Amino acid sequence: MNLASQSGEAGAGQLLFANFNQDNTSLAVGSKSGYKFFSLSSVDKLEQIYECTDTEDVCIVERLFSSSLVAIVSLKAPRKLKVCHFKKGTEICNYSYSNTILAVKLNRQRLIVCLEESLYIHNIRDMKVLHTIRETPPNPAGLCALSINNDNCYLAYPGSASIGEVQVFDTINLRAANMIPAHDSPLAALAFDASGTKLATASEKGTVIRVFSIPEGQKLFEFRRGVKRCVSICSLAFSMDGMFLSASSNTETVHIFKLEAVREKPPEEPTTWTGYFGKVLMASTSYLPSQVTEMFNQGRAFATVRLPFCGHKNICSLTTIQKIPRLLVGASDGYLYMYNLDPQEGGECALMRQHRLDGSMETTSEIVDSASHDCPLATQTYGTAAAKGAYVPSSPTRLGKGQDANLEAYTDDLGAVGGACLEDEASALRLDEDSEHPPMILRTD
């Protein structure tokens, strides 16, 4: 979640970025002063597990599961991606691109770099560029989603700037898998489930959430977030078991939907006048316009969360902490909110804790009463905020780091420049160990 405003200013607490890792076990936060990682193993305490202040103005920071591999982009060099081993404090490699980096996605097979009109697919084991998807429709928000499943390793991105088409790309076989006509309006949010077999979508209108099978593109579920007003969807997130889907927006309500097939009950003859009227009403839907009929068949929220603010950009996560299902919301006001979810009854979720993203903690009573952190929403994306630097020529570059400045990098034919690794670090990094997954081949040519 990018938090920079149009002028490049950070959100509350100098925040520029916040995101959960792939299995929702940690939270990454980028700020004017660097970046931090927090463990999400406890509700009572937000444990800071790492802090880096060597790189300023971190606008993108993505961690690979619970490994030491991290991808970083800074506002000071918005076209440059650095891949680092954060526990050792070493840089593995770097790449420069022809335009501003808007998003980076990781799984154990691939690293995706999203520019406004192109997508770069890297092999995460050696960081080579495997494929480039060029001339994509303008995507200034950097909207894309990457499945975390090794077998169903799909990438989803907008196929149109005017309607809600989703392009699904197979990043293993490097070929297009499907095009899904998901919405009439342009896309606003995308999310895969953990198995990579379901894709949730929302449009800029924000009233309907749809779930499709992947790669077939068959519509499995359709949920109505609301009718009264159009909203800006900030985030979609599946639970790890794929049973629940959360949708957050710029309103004070987060909706949680339950993905279960509706069991058809055998028809019963009505015994009252109201029962008879209801039967006639349902029968009459076959004569109504298709848009109205769809509203009768759309699912409603299984559970809801009432946030103590309205208008903040945010990102949500459905996870299990201390054996209890939780909804986590990281917001541009500089706070992480933790709610309990009742998986049987649903209803309104209880707010358990609120933590400042600088590591301090506030109790629930302080949350409700305090309004000092209720700052305006950072509505503009990082892509519109970052200043465009000079064009990076397609020629070999050198790493400008002291004694290593003589080490030549390489240029990929597909347009990304860089990728050189430091020879001294190649022997020090033991990324073939299980604790340092994935194994990477560090090239020193």
UniProtKB/Swiss-Prot annotation:
SUPFAM superfamilies according to UniProt: WD40 repeat-like
Disulfide bonds: none
Short motif (L/FRRG motif): ranges: 223-226
WD repeats: 182-222, 228-267, 311-349
GO molecular function: phosphatidylinositol-3,5-bisphosphate binding; phosphatidylinositol-3-phosphate binding
Domain observations: The L/FRRG motif is required for recruitment to PtdIns3P.
PANTHER family: WD-REPEAT PROTEIN INTERACTING WITH PHOSPHOINOSIDES WIPI -RELATED
Name of this protein: WD repeat domain phosphoinositide-interacting protein 2
Organism: Mus musculus
Gene that this polypeptide is encoded by: Wipi2
